[in-house]
């Protein structure tokens, strides 16, 4: 069985969630089947689409140009990212005509995926609720954890943290459904309470520059000014293989969101960076990340929009060594559960079965 994994996102040195997921899916599938990855590159070029026509199995998110190319092909749609819910938050209650067209196009792609897919992938069980009309079987393939050694040899290249206040790391973007302002307010309050720390936004310019909006950049600039001198941001998106080094030099990973439908159905890809780096997590109630953090003791869960609760959580993790060490131990314990070779097993098993049927 020849497999092609497709993503409309960037795959390269600097990647966001969809590109990271596609590259790891291709890597794991490549251990069992001839596998090709078709993606956008950092210079804006795209891989040759010929592999889409030649494949026996296509795997990818619903996207422009991704469809069954010939009779006999099987197609697996990856629905890990609740795009419709994200767009509704991004465009607000009064979307422009162009935004409405975009939203309708994405809804059409989802409907096509549900009607023609041979197999559907979601990231966790609750996402099944989004697709009650699905005709194909649904399997759960969460996001995964990369090798613990990805960036270990680069630690010496980063500025030393000796003598610096503990870093609270915001590892993702500043999308409309997230809540960076509460993180900023909390870090200001912690410092004003006499506990030194700083908040670092790991990177600001997403690799797929077509998705950048000036207003989002402006909001981040305002937050940086408001939080100075306790809040900083790296000027560029950090290379994927360097992220673990930055996390390991941080004391806490923070990921906060607003109380929206997106929050309930999103898996939070940056959660898995924190698991790989074994850095305790502060996250907002509701959603996969909050449930995992609370159930497995990986950090602290806080109410939405409550900067006081976030500040208390930061102080608790910074001052309570026993709690901090328990979180680190629990992160190390669950890491192997989310290794890419483990989380992709349901997909690999289906493809092995399809291969037997073809033989």
Describe each model-derived feature in a short phrase:
Residues 49, 83, 99-120:
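Membrane-proximal helix-turn-helix segments that form the acceptor-binding/catalytic region
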Residues 4-6, 121, 159-178, 184-187, ...:
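Conserved donor-binding/catalytic core segment of Leloir-type glycosyltransferases
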Residues 118, 245-264, 279:
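Acidic donor-binding loop of glycosyltransferase active sites
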Residues 295-296, 300-307, 316-321:
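Conserved acidic donor-binding segment of nucleotide-sugar-dependent glycosyltransferases
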Residues 165, 203-206, 212-247:
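Nucleotide-activated donor-binding/catalytic signature segment of Leloir-type glycosyltransferases, i.e.
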Residues 305, 322-353:
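A charged, aromatic-enriched C-terminal amphipathic alpha-helix characteristic of glycosyltransferases
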Residues 110-138, 147-149:
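A short, active-site helix/loop in glycosyltransferases that binds the activated sugar's phosphate group
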Residues 71-93, 100, 121, 139-142:
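Active-site proximal beta-strand in glycosyltransferases
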């Amino acid at each position: 069985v020849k497999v092609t994994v497709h993503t409309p996102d960037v795959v390269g040195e600097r990647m966001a969630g969809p590109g990271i997921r596609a590259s790891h899916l291709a890597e794991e599938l490549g251990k069992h089947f001839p596998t090709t990855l078709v993606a956008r590159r950092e210079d804006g070029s795209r891989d040759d689409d010929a592999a889409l026509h030649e494949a026996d199995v296509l795997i990818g998110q619903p996207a422009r140009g991704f469809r069954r190319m010939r009779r006999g092909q099987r197609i697996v749609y990856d629905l890990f990212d609740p795009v419709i819910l994200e767009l509704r938050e991004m465009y607000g209650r009064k979307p422009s005509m162009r935004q409405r067209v975009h939203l309708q196009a994405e809804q059409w792609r989802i409907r096509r995926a549900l009607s023609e897919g041979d197999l559907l992938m979601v990231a966790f069980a609750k996402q099944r609720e989004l697709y009650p009309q699905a005709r194909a079987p649904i399997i759960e393939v969460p996001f995964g954890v990369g090798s613990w050694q990805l960036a270990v040899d680069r630690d010496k290249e980063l500025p030393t943290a000796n003598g610096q206040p503990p870093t609270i790391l915001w590892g993702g973007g500043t999308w409309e459904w997230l809540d960076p302002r509460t993180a900023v307010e909390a870090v200001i309050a912690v410092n004003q309470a006499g506990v030194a720390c700083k908040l670092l936004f790991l990177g600001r310019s997403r690799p797929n520059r077509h998705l950048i909006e000036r207003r989002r950049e402006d909001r981040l600039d305002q937050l940086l000014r408001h939080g100075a001198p306790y809040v900083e941001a790296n000027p560029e998106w950090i290379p994927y293989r360097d992220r673990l080094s930055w996390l390991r030099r941080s004391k806490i990973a923070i990921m906060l969101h607003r109380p929206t439908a997106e929050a309930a159905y999103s898996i939070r890809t940056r959660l898995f960076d924190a698991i790989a780096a074994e850095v305790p997590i502060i996250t907002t109630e509701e959603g996969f990340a909050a449930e995992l953090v609370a159930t497995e003791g990986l950090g602290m869960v806080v109410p939405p929009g409550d900067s006081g609760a976030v500040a208390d959580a930061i102080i608790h993790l910074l001052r309570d060594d026993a709690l901090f060490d328990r979180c680190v131990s629990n992160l190390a314990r669950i890491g192997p559960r989310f290794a890419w070779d483990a989380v992709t097993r349901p997909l690999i098993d289906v493809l092995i079965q399809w291969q037997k049927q073809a033989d």
